Structures are given as structure tokens and as C-alpha cells.
């Protein structure tokens, strides 16, 4: 898995400004070759009490700049199966839902904030409507764990 991940993933050191900007150049090269890319736009992942963190601009700016559509994906079970408090996670399948494609080809940079907000709202709505409620259960578990510590 590690070898494949390293070959396919665009690695970024979020604490290093150079590394963050280098990602754009690398992603542009991948896109120019006709490959699709998958970007997780959440600002932060470590606060388990938040259902869906705000999105960063990079993925959306890249879509507008390269005139590419966005296919939002909802990963229902990540908070429960891969939490930051590792002793409470467990292996298994992840449920994923592809939302309708968003045509970013017609958008301009001034549409960026609106695009980010609309995409965030759509993903969050689907998470809240999940019949299994795994993300919400993970938040409840985290609150119980952190309050008893």
C-alpha cells in the first residue's frame, strides 16, 4: 500500500509554505496529462467534534483555473473508522457517495467563495442525513472520551 500511495498521492507538508505551493505545480502537471485528481479540501482534520471543517480555497481555485468540473465525494465513515484517537477506530469498508458534478468551467475567480460555501453545504447536508449517523456517533464518542480524560 505504501508504495502505491507514494506513487499516486501528491504529498504536502501543510506547515511548509513552499511545500503547499509546490503542490499546485505538481497537480497542474498531472491534470495536463489528462489524469483526475482527488483533493480533500478540509482545513483541518484533528478536531473530532466538528462534523465537517471549513474548506480551503486551493481545490476550488484549481478547478476554476483549469476549467475542470468538481465531483464532490462524501465519505460517511472516516470519522468513526479513522479517528485521530486511534484506539477507537476499526478496519472495514467505507461508504462513499458521489454528489452531482459541479461545472466549474464556467466560473470565474470571483465565484470562488460561493462555490466553496455551496459545496461545503451540500456535503454537510448529506452527512447529516446519513441514516447510519456514523459521523455524528463519532463526534458523540469523542466528546465522551475527551470529557472523561
Where are the language model's segments positioned?
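Non-catalytic C-terminal accessory region of glycerolipid acyltransferases
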Residues: 23-149
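Catalytic core of membrane glycerolipid acyltransferases/transacylases, capturing the structured
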Residues: 1-18
Amino acid at each position: 500500500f505504501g508504495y502505491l500511495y507514494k506513487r499516486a498521492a501528491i504529498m504536502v507538508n501543510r506547515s511548509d509554505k513552499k511545500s503547499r505551493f509546490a503542490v499546485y505545480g505538481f497537480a497542474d502537471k498531472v491534470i495536463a496529462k489528462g489524469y483526475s485528481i482527488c483533493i480533500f479540501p478540509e482545513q483541518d482534520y484533528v478536531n473530532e467534534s466538528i462534523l465537517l471543517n471549513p474548506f480551503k480555497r486551493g481545490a476550488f481555485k484549481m478547478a476554476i483555473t483549469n476549467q475542470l468540473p468538481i465531483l464532490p465525494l462524501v465519505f460517511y465513515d472516516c470519522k468513526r473508522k479513522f479517528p485521530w484517537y486511534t484506539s477507537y477506530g476499526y478496519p472495514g469498508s467505507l461508504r462513499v457517495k458521489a454528489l452531482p458534478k459541479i461545472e466549474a468551467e464556467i466560473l470565474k475567480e470571483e465565484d470562488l467563495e460561493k462555490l466553496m460555501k455551496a459545496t461545503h453545504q451540500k456535503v454537510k447536508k448529506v452527512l447529516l442525513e446519513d441514516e447510519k449517523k456514523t459521523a455524528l456517533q463519532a463526534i458523540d464518542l469523542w466528546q465522551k472520551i475527551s470529557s472523561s480524560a
